[in-house]
Amino acid sequence: MSELFHHIATRPADLVAGWRDGAPVSHGAWLARVRAWAALGARTPGARVALFHDDSLEFAAALLGAWLSGKTVWLSADTLPASCAALGQAVDAFWGQFPPAHAPGAPGPQDAWEGAIVAPAPDHPAVVVFTSGSTGQPAPIPKRLAQLLDEVAALQAQFGAGLEGAAVLATVSHQHIYGLLFRILWPLAAGRAIHAARHEFP
C-alpha cells in the first residue's frame, strides 16, 4: 500500500519524472511541487478540494500534495459554470485552473512542506469522480486510496513486464478515472515518465 509513496520519496532527484514542452522535468523538481501543494493543503481549511489542471505533471503534484495534507480531491471533467456550481456545493476550496470567480488556490513561493512522504491510511477517501451523465445528472463516486492502488497493482501485474523504461502519453484526460489510473497513478507507481501535455488524436 505504501510502495507508491515510498518510491516517490526515495527515487533519485535527477531521475526524469516527465516531459514538458520537450524538456525533461527531474524527479527532484517535481517532488518540490508535491511539497508545495502539500503546504498549500496544510493551510487550506476543510477536507475537500476540487482540482482541475491541464498539465499532467502539475496535476499529479497537486494530487499527491492534497493526499499528504489529508484532503479528498474532487475531480471535474471541465470548468463550465454548471460544473463549478455543483462542485461549490460539495468542496471547501478550488485548486488549479478554475475560473477566477472561484478563487482557485495555487502554491506560493513560500510553500515548501517539510513533512515525511508517507502513505495516508488505506481507507482515506482519496478522490471523488463523476459519472458521464449520459443517462442523467453526473453522479459523484467516491474512491478510497486502497481501491485506487489495488487497480494500479492489477495493471502493473497484467501489463507492466513489457513496459520498462516506457514514457506515458495519453489521449484520455486525467480528470477522468481511466486517465487518472493509466496516465497518473500507474506511471507514478512504476517510475515511468509522464508527458505533461495530453496527446491529441487524431
Per-region residue spans from a language model:
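A short N-terminal helical cap/helix-turn-helix that marks the beginning
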Residues: M1-V16
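AMP-binding/adenylate-forming
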Residues: Q89-P99, P142-Q158, L163-P202
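Conserved pre-ATP/AMP-binding loop-to-beta segment of ANL
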Residues: A9-A13, A112-F130, A161-V168
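Conserved AMP-binding/adenylate-forming
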Residues: A39-T79, A166-H174
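Conserved AMP-binding A3 loop
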Residues: P24-G28, V118, H124-A153
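Conserved AMP-binding/adenylate-forming core of the ANL superfamily
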Residues: D14-R43, K143-A146
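Flexible, low-complexity linker/hinge segments
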Residues: P99-P125, E151-V152, A157
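ATP-dependent adenylate-forming carboxylate-activation enzymes
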Residues: H53, W74-L87, R192-P202
